[in-house]
Every structure is written in C-alpha cells, then in structure tokens.
C-alpha cells in the first residue's frame, strides 16, 4: 500500500474525446474550445468537488490561432462554467504540450502554489492546420538541418540509423490497429472516452464515442502496397506507419493528496517523477530516450521496473527506434497495449494527457502498479512521466 504525503501530486480522474479524422471527420462542425469544455464539465460531473477550488486550468495546444487562439485555456474554463475565480493558461511544447500542462500543475502543487488543477490539451487539425500561420526563421538552417522541420524525414533518419526495416514498420502499424480495435470492442476505452456530439458522414447528428481513425479491416497486404510518404526514392515510412492527423481533446483532474483526502476523493495514481530532455532536431523522435532516462533516475528506478508503458507512436520507425534504445524490443507486450497513435491519431496538443489517461486505465485493467508515459517532440525534445497507482 502506497502511503501518500500531503504534497504528493495525485491523479483523481482523466478523460478524453474520441479521436476524429481530420478530413471530413465526425468533429468537422465542432470547435476545439467547445470539445475541450465538454471534458472539463465531465470531470466536474464525475467527481464530487467544488469547482471554486480550481486554481488554474492549464491547456496544451500547438497552433494557438483561430478558434484555438487568445488563450484557449481561459476560454475553455469560461465555456465550461468554471467559476471566474479560477485562472486559465495555454502551454505549447509542441507534441508534448498537454503532458507539459500536467508537469506545470504538478510543480505548482509541489511548491504550494495551488491544490486543484484541471489540465488537458486539444488540437483540431481539421480547422487549424499544423503549419497554419507558421513562419520559420531562414537562419535556423545554420543551426539544424532544414529537413528537421519535416517530421516524416526525421522518422526516415531514425529508421536508417537503427536498421528498422519496412516489414518491421508495417507489422508495428498493423498491430497498433489490432490492439486499438480490440480495446474498443472489449470496452477498454469506455472509462476514458466522453461522448461528444458530432456528425456522421451524411451530416446527421451523432454522439461520438468511438475513435474514428482505427482501421479494423487493415491487413499486411494493404500496408505493403503503400508507397513511401516522405522519401519516394529510398523511404520506408508510409501513411500507414505514421500517426494520423486527427481532432481530439483530453483532460485530467490533478490535486495534492491532502486536498483529495479533505474532499473525500480517491486518487487513482500519484506522479513519481517527470522529465523533459532535448536531442538533435534531425532525430526528434529519439527524445523519449533521454527524457525517460532522466525520469527513471529521478524516481530511483530502472526501465525494468516499468510494468505498463505508453509511447506515443509518431511513426513506427520512431517507436521501434525508441524501444530498441530503451531495451524494450522484446517487451512490446507491455507497450501501448490498447494501441497507439498510428491507430488512434495524434491531435498534437491533446496527445500528452491522452496517453497518460490511457496509461492509467491500462494499468488498472492489467493490475500493474508502475507506468511510464513518454513521447517525442518536434525539433528535438522528449517528455516523460512515471506514475504509480495508489
């Protein structure tokens, strides 16, 4: 039995939307801020606490413009009916934005700057494209390879460096879809997905509760027919072994252990350690390796202590390279057991909290105690969180 100290940071609950296709998907008529507000309301409804206790709403979002602009974190709180006394901020660490939101809230709790936080993230890549309004400095090419801005080519680089074959990537991608669909049909996502109204292909209103990007009918034969998506001459990375562009949001209720006890709320897990790390931008997908190593050191653990792992699948070549570097190639039965971003999609600002929520549910379903959530970040970073069930 884990004994909690008053300032331990605990996860009380976590939710997410289903993941929608970016192109003509089920959330094509739903705004990013509206989708996020639904999740915040769900956290309040699912947990018996006074929202006046919320110190801050911290939201991850990458492209902060259009409907995602003007501090979407604050707008979400107002839309959700959270008392105006709570603050709201928006964080950007690219793909790691909502995990950084978790880390920021945790650090504030640890240092006595609040006890109750709602964190999360969103990206509506159908409404706000990944490169919308982006103007990169031409001088950046003096400091890192120009192709470092092209995520698919960084995956190709990692694949070549680690001798990851096309066949291995196709098998990895196919398994992601298989696991995700099995988790869907067996109800393993039911506790984390909050139904949000969207539209079907014909435009009819529907409650969206199933991830739209999963391909339950995917076969190896289909995947092998696809051409390389980023390097047409010698490439091995295809659309089927890349995380899908998608629309989605995630949210978590975080507080100090002392506050949870006062409110009579049962924590589901505590945060054992957190870390970020940088690496060469040309191999940005390697970032989870140094970030995980830092987090393990801070927790006084080794990779062998991790019982369940969520590794964001930016690309199969990237995921397999990270597994190889962390000596997890032969332990893929504990990694992304409910599928990953290749099958579920990767709405940039959403994914960090999403994989942490999925990790927590997977740990409860598998009855494991220690888990790791980690992900790569564009331009050469990684982020990692180790949690322990309580």
From Swiss-Prot:
Entry keyword set: Acyltransferase, Cytoplasm, Fatty acid metabolism, Lipid degradation, Lipid metabolism, Transferase
Reactions the enzyme catalyzes: an acyl-CoA + acetyl-CoA = a 3-oxoacyl-CoA + CoA
Name by which UniProt lists this protein: 3-ketoacyl-CoA thiolase
Gene label: fadA
Active site (record annotation): 95 (acyl-thioester intermediate), 346 (proton acceptor), 376 (proton acceptor)
Pfam name, any one: Thiolase_N
GO MF term list: acetyl-CoA C-acyltransferase activity
HAMAP family, alphabetized: FadA
Pathway: Lipid metabolism; fatty acid beta-oxidation
């Amino acid at each position: 039995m884990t004994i909690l100290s008053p300032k331990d940071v605990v996860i009380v609950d976590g939710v997410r939307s289903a993941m929608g296709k970016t192109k003509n998907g089920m959330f094509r008529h739903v705004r990013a801020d509206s989708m996020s507000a639904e999740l915040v309301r769900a956290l309040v409804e699912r947990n018996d606490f006074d929202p006046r206790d919320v110190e801050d709403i911290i939201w991850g979002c990458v492209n902060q413009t259009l409907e995602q602009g003007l501090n979407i974190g604050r707008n979400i709180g107002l839309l959700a009916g959270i008392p105006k006394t709570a603050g709201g901020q928006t964080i950007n660490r690219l793909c790691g934005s909502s995990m950084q939101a978790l880390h920021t809230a945790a650090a504030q709790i640890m240092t006595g700057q609040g006890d109750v936080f709602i964190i999360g993230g969103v990206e509506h890549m159908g409404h706000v494209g990944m490169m919308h309004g982006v103007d990169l400095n031409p001088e950046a090419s003096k400091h890192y390879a120009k192709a470092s801005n092209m995520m698919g080519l960084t995956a190709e680089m990692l694949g070549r460096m680690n001798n990851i074959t096309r066949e291995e990537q196709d098998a990895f991608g196919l398994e992601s879809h298989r696991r995700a669909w099995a988790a869907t049909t067996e109800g393993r996502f039911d506790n984390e997905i909050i139904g949000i109204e969207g539209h079907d292909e014909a435009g009819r209103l529907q409650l969206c509760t199933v991830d739209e990007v999963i391909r339950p009918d995917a076969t190896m034969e289909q995947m092998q027919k696809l051409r390389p998506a980023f390097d047409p001459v010698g490439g091995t990375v295809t659309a089927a072994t890349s995380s899908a562009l998608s629309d989605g949001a995630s949210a978590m209720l975080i507080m100090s252990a002392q506050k949870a006890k006062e409110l009579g709320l049962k924590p589901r897990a505590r945060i054992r350690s957190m870390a970020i790390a940088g690496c060469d931008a040309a191999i940005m997908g390697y970032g989870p390796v140094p970030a995980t190593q830092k987090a393990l050191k801070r927790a006084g653990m080794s990779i062998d202590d991790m019982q369940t792992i969520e590794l964001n699948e930016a690309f199969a070549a990237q995921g397999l390279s990270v597994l190889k570097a962390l000596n997890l190639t032969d332990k893929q039965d504990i990694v992304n057991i409910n599928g990953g971003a290749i099958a579920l999609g990767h709405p940039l600002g959403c994914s960090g909290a999403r994989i942490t929520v999925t990790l927590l549910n997977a740990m409860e379903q598998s009855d494991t105690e220690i888990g790791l959530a980690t992900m790569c970040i564009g331009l050469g970073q990684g982020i990692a969180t180790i949690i322990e069930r309580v």
